[in-house]
Structure formats: C-alpha cells, structure tokens
From Swiss-Prot:
This protein's name: 4-hydroxythreonine-4-phosphate dehydrogenase
Lineage of origin: Bacteria, Pseudomonadati, Pseudomonadota, Alphaproteobacteria, Hyphomicrobiales
Family matches, as Pfam families: PdxA (PF04166)
More details: The active site is located at the dimer interface.
Organism of origin: Rhizobium meliloti (strain 1021)
The protein's role, per its UniProt record: Catalyzes the NAD(P)-dependent oxidation of 4-(phosphooxy)-L-threonine (HTP) into 2-amino-3-oxo-4-(phosphooxy)butyric acid which spontaneously decarboxylates to form 3-amino-2-oxopropyl phosphate (AHAP).
Cofactor requirement: Zn(2+); Mg(2+); Co(2+)
GO biological process, one term: pyridoxine biosynthetic process
EC class: oxidoreductase
GO cellular component, one term: cytoplasm
Pathway: Cofactor biosynthesis; pyridoxine 5'-phosphate biosynthesis; pyridoxine 5'-phosphate from D-erythrose 4-phosphate: step 4/5
EC number annotated for this UniProt entry: 1.1.1.262
Amino acid sequence: MSETSIGPVALTMGDPAGIGPDITLSVWAKRADRPTPPFLYVGDPALLAARAKLLGQTVPICETDCPGAVAAFRQALPVWPVRSPAPVIPGNPDAANASAVTDAIDTAVRLVLAGEASALATNPISKAVLYEAGFRFPGHTEYLADLAARATGVAALPVMMLAGPKLRAVPVTIHIPLKDVPAALTPDLIYETCTITAADLRSRFGLPAPRLAIAGLNPHAGEGGALGREDDAVIRPVIDRLRAEGLDVVGPLPADTMFHDRARETYDVAICMYHDQALIPAKALGFDDSVNVTLGLPFIRTSPDHGTAFSLAGKGIAREESLLAALRLAAELARNAGGTKR
C-alpha cells in the first residue's frame, strides 16, 4: 500500500518556540536525498516561513488539505494553517501561544480519525508552558487519549513505546517518581500494558506472534524474594496469566542482562517496570533514530524521542533524524494496518 493511497502523515507543530519548526524544515528540505513519506504540517505557515528565513533556507510553503498535501509534497511543504496568536521568538516560549499548540493537536487528531490523514506524528511540546495556560493533562499522551475517548466514546489506556532499530521497549509506569513505582505496579496495569502492546505489534508492526520479555522490578528480579517481593508476588502471576492466554512471554528477567546483543535476539519487545529501565537502554542503543510510539489509541501516533530543545531553536544545529524516523515509522505502521484505525 502506497502513501498516496493512505494519505499523508499529519505532523503537529509542537511548541512554536522550540525546534519543531527547524527539524520539520530540515526533513522536508532533504527529502530528495532520502526516503521521506508525505506529511502535512498542522501549524502556522507564517512561523515556518520566518524560521526558514532565519535559518537561511529556501522552502516553498503551500496551504492545502490532506489530498493536496500528497500531490504538493515534492514541490512545496504542505501546511494546514493553525495561526499562532502571539509573536514567536525562537527559544522564548510564550503561554499566549498555548492555544495554537493544542488547536494543532486537535486538528491533526480530527484529520486522522476522519481517515483523511494516515497517522499522527507530533513535534515536541512544553508541558510547563501549557500548564501556565491552564492545560490540565499530565502530558501530550494523556491529552491524545482524552481526545480519542471523546471522539469514539471508548476510554483508551495509552502505552508508551520507544522503538528503534535495535530495541523496542515499553515502560509500564511512566512519569512518576521512582519511590512511587512499586505501589503503582498493579497486576491489572502490567497485564493491560502487555496485552495492548501485543495487540499493536500484531496489527501495526506486522508481528503475528510477538515475543515479550518482561523485566523484573528489583535487582536480579528479586532473587527469590531476598531483594524484594514484587517480582514473585506481582509480576510473575501476570506472566502466568499471559502464557495461559497463549502469549509468548518470558520473565521476570533481571534487567541488567536483558539488553545485550544476544538477549535482544530472543524477543520483540522489552516490557519494563519504570521509565528509566526502558528508556536508558532504548536511547543508548539508538539515540538519533529511536521513536516514541503511543500504543492503545484508535489511531497511530509517533513522535521524536526528544523535547523542545529551546536552546537550539533557530540556530540551525538541531538534528532532524528522530523526526524523520518518527514520520517513516508512522507511515510504515499505517501501511501495515491498512488504514488509520484499530
């Protein structure tokens, strides 16, 4: 299935003062040198033009819709306009532009759910800036889950995956303090995270029989209870349940021996118990080409595995590889899924 048959990837602008505009321009400008799926930038065309001028780039920009984006992509950077209400200064975020950030997300999600765009890719946002403007969600992912639930009437449990050429890793708990992880690791949360991950690996990643390796929480996976009870009392019963339901699952495994080359050959995804247990190996093995994928949503969502990098904005030094990887993976998952919805 070609990109023309499934529509462009809808790419949100992210925080306009960050590097989102810079890396978007770089990806498009280098499209002739490497495979780049057609995308539709949902954001401020004037911002893109100003950033291109600041960076010394000549980038033609055209305002268009989804079908027009695919047709125009080789000649111009297609934009679905969402205007920023306040002037944008690279590196200086302004809460006055928070409404444009969320409007771009809302618009892109609507386009994907309507089947006009094939998938969603999101440039980085600043939670601190959005909080200043009254944003009430813990982060980007939770906001997307709320939009999906309101659109479909079905609550979604979003699951975070870092996907790179050498490793896919999923943290069960995400942005919580390490001291709170043991209490947050409930059997239901571990089970749902694993089943959602397996379902998306089948339907979107083209893996009919995914292999899951589940990490323990404690050193040496608890060492029979000597170093903690969670591995045997909480994690192991979930693994037994998953196996009984036919999933290919191993664990709980000591995390310090899960990520070397030979170990990674034995599984398709590592299910980790907390944020750094998953993201440290994922980023160490593929910092520039790892992609943040949100599983469990009724649409495909990817993003680069970095933040707004305000200190780099407008300087021509931000690297675009992770965004390109996010766009490529979004298009690949859409082709695998045969459309946009679960």
